[in-house]
Regions:
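Acidic, histidine-bearing metal-coordination/catalytic regions of metal-dependent phosphoesterases
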Residues: 2-150, 158-243, 249-277
Length: 277
């Protein structure tokens, strides 16, 4: 009421006219969401390296089976937005060079330990920065036009209960710059450059690893760039709130962290092959 009175005074408007105008439903915003465009698999099959392509958007589908009757066509003109929120979850920011990452477990059982190493591990902060930009671009609801009030991040922000991973994720959401490197400056130190670690994708030359046989590309300089770059984030434009996930408090999201694991995480050696574990 106070805000409406102030606006009326500033604009020289009759409060009796301004009130009803403010109470009118907002118009849907033209923002980039999956209503406009989606991402689909371009390549055929699920065995080899897969590429992606843009695809048409997906419209809202009224659940008339739940409603039990036809929807009122005039409902779109009467909509009110209780609140418009952004949602992120399972970001899994990774310190890909941490001695506590047990990548060789993948060689023992690729299915059981699928999360121990993935080709994109060094790029998680880049992905999160782009998620922030996409969230900011959707500042107004595509359904009602209501402004975004806040963003909720529902857990698994850090992948391994790591203070560094937690710091990086907070910095990206807050709009701080960072260099995602916990080792020697400008140098990636990990299984993706170790020749004996055939369980990992080697972007410099994947011919000798498991991924090369499935068509994974050669990308020279990728790892050096990943740990040398400064990741710039514009930061979320609205307040954000987070809750705990299992990866935020447990090792690999499953195991209690004891003294031996803590010593491994803070040590200066990193296992390359499964027998070393």
């Amino acid at each position: 009421l106070a805000a409406g009175t102030s606006l009326a005074a500033v604009w020289g408007m009759d409060l009796a006219r301004l009130g009803p105008a403010l109470a009118q439903p907002l118009r849907p915003a033209d923002v980039p969401t999956t209503l406009q465009q989606t991402i689909r698999q371009r390549s055929v099959g699920n065995i080899n390296y897969r590429t992606l392509a843009t695809a048409p958007g997906e419209p809202y589908v009224p659940r008339l089976d739940l409603l039990g009757k036809a929807a009122d066509p005039a409902r779109t003109a009467r909509r009110r937005s209780l609140v418009y929120l952004g949602h992120m979850t399972d970001i899994h920011i990774m310190d890909a060079q941490s001695p506590a990452r047990l990548e060789p477990l993948s060689a023992q059982s690729p299915s059981t330990w699928a999360g121990s190493i993935r080709p994109q591990d060094t790029l998680t902060t880049n992905v999160q920065a782009q998620m922030v930009a996409a969230m900011n671009a959707a500042a107004f609801s595509p359904v009602t036009g209501a402004p975004m009030a806040a963003v909720f991040n529902t857990g698994d922000s850090a992948d391994q209960h790591s203070t560094l991973e937690l710091r990086w994720y907070i910095d990206v959401l807050d709009g701080q710059s960072l260099t995602p490197n916990s080792g020697a400056a400008g140098q990636y130190e990990g299984p993706q450059v170790w020749e004996e670690a055939t369980y990992a994708w080697h972007p410099e030359d994947p011919a000798g690893d498991w991924f090369g046989a499935y068509g994974f590309p050669t990308i020279p300089g990728m790892l050096t760039a990943a740990v040398s770059q400064t990741v710039e984030s514009e930061g979320l434009a609205v307040p954000w709130y987070a809750v705990y996930g299992n990866h935020d408090t447990l090792y690999y999201g499953a195991f209690e962290i004891g003294e031996s694991l803590r010593a491994l995480a803070l040590g200066d050696r990193k296992p390359a092959l499964y027998p070393a574990l």
